[in-house]
Curated annotation (Swiss-Prot):
<dbReference type="GO" id="GO:0006412">
    <property type="term" value="P:translation"/>
</dbReference>
<dbReference type="InterPro" id="IPR023476">
    <property type="entry name" value="Pep_tRNA_hydro_II_dom_sf"/>
</dbReference>
<dbReference type="InterPro" id="IPR034759">
    <property type="entry name" value="Pept_tRNA_hydro_arch"/>
</dbReference>
<comment type="similarity">
    <text>Belongs to the PTH2 family.</text>
</comment>
<comment type="function">
    <text>The natural substrate for this enzyme may be peptidyl-tRNAs which drop off the ribosome during protein synthesis.</text>
</comment>
<dbReference type="InterPro" id="IPR002833">
    <property type="entry name" value="PTH2"/>
</dbReference>
<dbReference type="GO" id="GO:0004045">
    <property type="term" value="F:peptidyl-tRNA hydrolase activity"/>
</dbReference>
<keyword id="KW-0963">Cytoplasm</keyword>
<protein>
    <recommendedName>
        <fullName>Peptidyl-tRNA hydrolase</fullName>
        <ecNumber>3.1.1.29</ecNumber>
    </recommendedName>
</protein>
<dbReference type="GO" id="GO:0005829">
    <property type="term" value="C:cytosol"/>
</dbReference>
<keyword id="KW-0378">Hydrolase</keyword>
<dbReference type="Pfam" id="PF01981">
    <property type="entry name" value="PTH2"/>
</dbReference>
């Protein structure tokens, strides 16, 4: 089974619309990286494009997760906001990882809680 995970910073106070847009940026960005890298995109598409949104504590943890994903060879995309609405330009908001095999992504994000 394959999935994509989006990790959102828990310390940012974002409106629902802003959060939805940032998650969409992370999902699409990670998908495009995966497609370029030869990751199993077609399998993920056939299986229904499973996506899971998780929460981390802060920017530092998000950056650590990004580095770990890169070290493990997982396609990933770090979102930096343009600063046109709610946030300062360059604010790191979330991270998209995958699509890739669930067990590979879980090695990076398996301890994180769901975003609720």
């Amino acid at each position: 089974m394959y999935k994509q995970v989006i990790v959102v910073r828990g310390d940012l106070k974002l409106s629902r619309g802003k959060l939805a847009a940032q998650v969409a940026h992370a999902s699409l960005g990670a998908f495009l990286r995966a497609k370029e890298s030869g990751a199993p995109v077609e399998e993920w598409l056939r299986e229904g494009q499973k996506k899971v949104v998780l929460k981390c504590k802060d920017k530092e943890e998000l950056l650590e997760l990004h580095e770990l994903a890169k070290r493990r060879g997982l396609p990933s995309f770090l979102v930096r906001d343009a600063g046109l609405t709610e946030l300062e330009p360059g604010t790191v908001t979330c991270l998209g990882i995958g699509p890739e095999r669930e067990e590979e992504i879980d090695r990076v994000t398996g301890d994180l809680p769901l975003l609720r």
